[in-house]
């Protein structure tokens, strides 16, 4: 039977405890609250020393019908109570793979990276697929993550997985193969100005017919763009 302790492994253990300054955590919480107010996405902060959630936003995407206070109180127990049992092993696998990858990076670059993956959460017995991104918020001097910012939104895929490591200033990223247990380098495709125009209009909520009216050349681009971007 899985327990919350399974999420805490040597690769995410805090070693330099004396460096932790809890007098500054309110600044991180205030920043997360400000981001939450301006976004539909759910936001929360993980404390890898105390093994709990430091903050949980009121945005409903991640709450599974619970209050933010309840989710905060649950902490890592949330993943065991609100994630389907057959996907909990996936979370443990990507947790191990992600930290193993992360600890190979130069310390100076670690805040530039984030991990992204999809999994289901349960709300009144109904499965909802979400995308989950995690990025370092505060590090110890040896590069260990003390606090991490997590952002949860609706997934654009149709199944769980899709584990990726991205660097904010690079078009290169890494995809984790759950069968071979290896990371594979990929390159983000470069969009033309026409493709960017189509995506921009789609994000604004225009339908394909409306986009076609605004851009008669849309048919040249729509085959190159993932259907998940066009709704």
Specify the residue positions occupied by each region the protein language model found.
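Short, flexible, glycine/charge-rich loop motifs used to bind or transfer phosphoryl groups or to couple energy/partner
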Residues: 32-34, 108, 187-188
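Short, structured secondary-structure boundary patches
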Residues: 16, 90-94, 231
């Amino acid at each position: 039977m899985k327990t919350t302790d399974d999420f805490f492994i040597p690769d995410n253990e805090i070693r330099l405890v004396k460096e932790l300054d809890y007098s500054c955590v309110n600044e991180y919480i205030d920043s997360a609250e400000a981001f939450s107010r301006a976004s539909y996405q759910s936001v929360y902060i993980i404390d890898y020393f105390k093994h709990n959630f430091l903050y949980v936003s009121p945005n409903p995407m991640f709450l599974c019908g619970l209050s933010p206070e309840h989710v905060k109180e649950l902490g890592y127990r949330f993943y065991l109570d609100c994630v389907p049992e057959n996907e909990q092993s996936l979370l443990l696998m990507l947790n191990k793979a992600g930290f193993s990858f992360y600890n190979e990076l130069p310390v100076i670059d670690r805040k530039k990276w984030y991990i992204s993956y999809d999994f289901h959460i349960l709300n009144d017995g109904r499965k909802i697929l979400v995308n989950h991104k995690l990025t370092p918020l505060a590090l110890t001097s040896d590069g260990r993550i003390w606090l991490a910012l997590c952002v949860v939104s609706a997934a654009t895929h149709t199944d769980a997985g899709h584990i990726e490591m991205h660097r904010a200033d690079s078009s290169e990223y890494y995809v984790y193969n759950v069968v071979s247990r290896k990371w594979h380098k990929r390159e983000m495709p470069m969009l033309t100005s026409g493709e960017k125009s189509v995506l921009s209009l789609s994000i604004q909520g225009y339908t394909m017919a409306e986009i076609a009216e605004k851009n008669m050349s849309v048919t040249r681009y729509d085959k190159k763009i993932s259907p998940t971007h066009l709704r």
